Amino acid sequence: VVRLVGSEMCIRDRYIGQIPKWDLSKVRPAGAPLKTFGGRASGPEPLESLFEFCVTTFKNAQGRKLSSLECHDVVCKIAEIVVVGGVRRSALISLSNLSDDRMRHAKAGQWWEQNGQRALANNSACYSEKPDIGIFMDEWKSLYDSKSGERGIFNRESANKMASKNGRRVVDGYEFGTNPCSEIILRDREFCNLSEAVIRVTDTEESLMKKVELLSLIHISEPTRRTTI
């Protein structure tokens, strides 16, 4: 059983070299049926892999703070194991400073061979003001050289302006971000709730249109949703 401790204490212990022990013997075994959601359990192995990854990451950073890329990798590794019934249940986007060279090259070259967890996140540079043309072109060149199409570009100043047009404003210094697909302007800790209209073999054109109509009504009342058909 995993014993929960204060996050600050847990992080402090990792920095001073104290390695925790964990017992996953009561985690549902791989292949066990999931009655509520359906599908099969992943078993304790993914969680074991996550814990070992975190321990290794903190060991490598002993005596210093984690870098932005190390933090990114830990979050991506967590997302990698969030699987229910064989279905991935996570999506990420990392918005990094324009000057962050580590994140700029996170998906450069054959990154997937040693850091497959990075596939779980989209990466974008966050522009808070109009950059110098030289800096802007350097960023575009690094995007091209990476051969992955990343980092992308997220214009935070524009997001703040667009949000203000709808009566939303920056509160307590927390500026606006976006969802993993960069479709929706969100506040800190807000979320995008993906909903789907499932097409079944028994559906007719009329029943499918009814599904889409109901989804649209829901989304009018809750604008931070995204529809997939």
Q: What feature does the model see in each segment?
A:
Residues 1-6, 11, 219-223, 227-229:
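Single conserved hydrophobic/aromatic residue that forms the stacking wall/gate
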Residues 8, 12-199, 204:
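Active-site cavity-forming subdomains of large catalytic enzyme subunits
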Residues 192, 196-221, 225-226:
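Long, charged, mostly alpha-helical binding arms that flank functional sites
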